[in-house]
A protein has these predicted regions:
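Extracellular leucine-rich repeat
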Residues: 1-582
Length: 582
C-alpha cells in the first residue's frame, strides 16, 4: 500500500500516526516542512519498506525516528540541509538498498559515519549535488555497493582516492547541464586503480591532454559512459580494455567514425554514438574489429552515405540491434545488410532512403523482427521492398505516402506473413482495398490514424479478429451496418476525432457503439460533427428518435384521407363517364 502526502503542509508527525495502516509499505512526505517527528511516528505498518523525506528541512539524521524501520529498503533524503551522514545509534540499515542524500550540504565523509552502513548489502548510495571536499581515508574500505553516485563534484581525485579498497558495480561521476564542465587529467584517475568497479559514467566532463595513459586504470571496466565529454577522437594505443562490453560516446565532436579507434575495445557488445555535434563520416570498416558487437546506435548524426551499409558494417556478424534513424540520405543496394544477417531490430526512421535496386535491401534479414521505416520517403510502389522478411513482427511505415493515396490489392505488405504490429499512421491514405491485408493473418495491432479514410476501408479488416485498431483522426462519417460485424470481432478500437454523422442514417452504428462502449478508447474525444445541432456532443450521449412521431402520424393520416377522397372521386368520375358513353 502506497501513501503519498507530498506538499500537504505537514509540520508535526505525532505518535502512532499510522498505527492502523498495517499494510502500508511506502510513505512519501516530500515537500512538507517538518518540525517534529515522534519516536513512534512510524509504528503501525508491518513492513514499511520505502520512506521519502525529500525537501522536508531535515538538517540532522537524529531527527528521523528509528522505531519500526527494520524492514526499510529505501530512504530518500534529498534536497535537505544535511551536513553529516551519521545515523542515530541503532538505526536499522541491514535491509537498506537505496540511500539518497543528493543535493544536501555534505562536505566531508568520515569513517565513523560510514560504519553504520556496514550491515547493508548491495546498497545504492547517492551523493549527487553535494560539494564533497574530502573523504577520510578508509571510509569506504572493504565496503561493497551496487552503485555510487557523486555527480556534480568538481574534484574527482578526492572521490576516487576516498573510494580506495571499495567495490561498486556502478560509479556515477558525471556533471549536469547547469554546472561547469570539469577538466579531467590522467592524474585524477589514479585512485581508480585501487578500487573495483564495473561501470563508470563521466558525462559532461572535459578531458585535458587525453592519451592512452588516461585509461590506464580503466582496464577492469565493463561499461564506460563518456557522453558530452568534448571528445574529438579516442587515442590509439589504449591497452588492456578487453573487459569492456558497453561504450557510450554520445554528443561528442567526432568527424569520422574511425576516430573512436574501435580496435582498442575488442570485446564490445554495445556501442552508442548518437547526437554527434558534427556531421559524422560513416567511413568504411571502422568497426570491423568489433566482431562481437550486438547493439549499435548511430542515430542523430547526420550520417550520409550513397552506398550503405555493407562496407561500413563490415565484419559485424553478431549485430542484433542497429539504429540509423535521424540521419541524412542513405543509398541502399540489394542486400544492403548482408554483413549483419542476425539483425533483429533495425531503425531507419526519419532517414531518407534511396533504394537503388529493384530487389529488397533487407532480403537477407531472415530473423529481423522489428523494422522502423517511418518518414523515410519510401517508394511504396516497389512490391519487392520488404521481400525476404519472413519473421518480421513489427513494421512502422508512418509518414510514407502510397500511390494514388490508396493501398491496392497488390502491395509491398504481401510477403509479411508473420507481421503482428503495423503502423500506417500519417500516410495520407484515402482508401484501402478490401483484400489489401489478406496475407496478414497474424495481426494484433493496426494503427491507421491521421489519414483520410472513410468507413468503407474497415472492410479490409474483415478477416481479422482480436486486434487493436486505431482509426483516430480520419474522415469517417458513417459506418455501414454490414461492417459492424468486422468491428465487433476486434478487442480495442479508437474512432476519436472523426467527423461522425449523428443522424438516423448512422443509427445502427451509434446504437452498436453505445452497446459496446467497453471496446473503445478515446471515447471522450469521439464526438458528432453532423448535424450542426449535435456538433461536439459525445457519441455515447447521443439519443436519436428515428421512428414516426405523433406529428408524423397526423400528417400521414391526413395524407391517406386525401388519397381516399381522391380515389372515391376518381371512381365516381370513371363510372359516370362509362355510363354516358353506353
Amino acid at each position: 500500500m502506497f501513501l503519498d502526502l507530498t506538499r500537504c503542509q505537514i509540520n508535526w508527525v505525532h505518535e502512532d500516526t499510522f498505527q492502523y495502516q498495517h499494510q502500508l509499505n511506502t510513505i512519501v512526505l516530500t515537500g512538507n516542512p517538518l518540525i517534529f517527528m515522534a519516536e513512534t511516528a512510524f509504528n503501525g505498518p508491518k513492513s514499511l519498506k520505502h520512506l521519502s523525506l525529500i525537501q522536508t528541512g531535515i538538517s540532522n539524521l537524529e531527527f528521523i525516528p528509528v522505531y519500526n524501520l527494520e524492514q526499510l529498503e529505501s530512504l530518500h533524503l534529498g534536497s535537505n540541509h544535511i551536513s553529516s551522514i551519521k545515523f542515530p545509534e541503532n538505526f536499522p540499515t541491514q535491509n537498506l538498498k537505496v540511500l539518497d542524500f543528493q543535493n544536501n550540504a555534505i562536505y566531508y565523509i568520515l569513517s565513523e559515519d560510514m560504519n553504520a552502513l556496514d550491515k547493508a548489502t548491495n546498497l545504492s548510495l547517492n551523493f549527487n549535488g553535494n560539494d564533497i571536499k574530502a573523504i577520510e581515508p578508509g571510509a569506504f574500505h572493504s565496503k561493497s555497493f551496487q552503485s555510487l553516485k557523486f555527480g556534480g563534484i568538481l574534484n574527482l581525485s578526492v572521490i576516487l582516492k576516498g573510494l580506495q579498497n571499495s567495490t561498486a558495480q556502478s560509479l556515477w561521476l558525471g556533471t549536469f547541464e547547469d554546472s561547469d564542465d570539469q577538466d579531467l587529467t590522467p592524474a585524477m584517475f589514479e585512485g581508480l586503480c585501487e578500487m573495483s568497479v564495473e561501470s563508470i559514467n563521466l558525462q559532461k566532463h572535459h578531458f585535458s591532454n587525453i592519451s592512452s595513459t588516461t585509461f590506464r586504470c580503466f582496464t577492469q571496466l565493463k561499461e564506460l559512459d563518456l557522453t558530452a565529454t568534448h571528445l574529438k577522437a579516442l587515442p590509439s594505443g589504449i591497452e588492456g580494455m578487453n573487459a569492456l562490453k558497453k561504450l557510450v560516446l554520445n554528443v561528442n565532436n567526432f568527424d569520422q567514425l574511425c576516430q573512436i579507434n574501435a580496435a582498442s575495445f575488442p570485446s564490445l557488445t554495445d556501442l552508442s554514438i548518437k547526437g554527434n555535434m558534427k556531421t559524422l563520416d560513416f567511413g568504411a570498416g571502422c568497426l570491423e574489429k568489433l566482431e562481437n558487437l550486438q547493439k549499435l546506435d548511430l542515430s542523430h548524426n547526420d550520417i550520409e552515405a550513397s552506398d550503405c551499409c555493407n562496407l561500413q558494417l563490415k565484419n559485424l556478424p553478431h549485430l542484433q540491434y542497429l539504429n540509423l534513424s535521424y540521419n541524412e540520405p542513405l543509398g541502399l543496394q540489394s542486400q544492403a545488410f548482408k554483413e549483419c544477417p542476425l539483425l533483429e531490430h533495425l531503425d531507419l526512421a526519419f532517414t531518407h532512403l534511396h533504394i537503388k535496386a529493384p530487389q529488397s535491401p533487407f532480403q537477407n534479414l531472415r530473423v529481423l523482427q522489428v523494422l522502423n521505416l517511418s518518414h523515410c520517403l519510401l517508394d511504396t510502389s516497389n512490391q519487392h521492398l520488404l521481400a525476404g522478411l519472413v519473421d518480421l513482427r513489427h513494421l512502422n511505415l508512418q509518414g510514407n505516402h502510397f500511390q494514388d493515396r490508396r493501398i491496392s490489392k497488390t502491395n509491398l505488405l504481401q510477403p509479411l506473413n508473420s507481421l503482428e504490429v503495423l503502423s500506417l499512421s500519417s500516410c495520407d491514405l484515402l482508401s484501402i482495398d478490401k483484400q489489401a491485408f489478406q496475407s496478414l493473418g497474424k495481426m494484433s495491432h493496426i494503427d491507421l490514424s491521421y489519414n483520410s479514410l472513410t468507413g468503407d476501408s474497415i472492410d479490409a479488416l474483415s478477416h481479422l479478429q482480436g486486434i487493436y485498431l486505431n482509426l483516430a483522426v480520419n474522415s469517417i462519417q458513417a459506418i455501414p451496418p454490414l461492417l459492424l460485424h468486422t468491428l465487433s470481432r476486434q478487442n480495442t478500437i479508437n474512432l476519436s476525432h472523426n467527423p461522425l454523422d449523428c443522424t438516423c442514417l448512422n443509427m445502427h452504428f451509434i446504437t452498436w457503439y453505445k452497446e459496446n462502449l467497453q471496446k473503445f478508447e478515446g471515447v471522450e474525444e469521439t464526438m458528432c460533427a453532423n448535424p450542426p445541432s449535435l456538433m461536439g456532443v459525445k457519441l455515447y450521449d447521443v439519443e436519436l428518435s428515428c421512428g414516426i412521431t405523433a406529428v408524423g402520424i397526423f400528417f400521414l393520416i391526413v395524407f391517406l384521407f386525401f388519397i381516399a377522397i381522391l380515389l372515391i372521386f376518381s371512381v365516381k368520375f370513371l363510372l359516370r363517364w362509362k355510363y354516358e358513353h353506353i
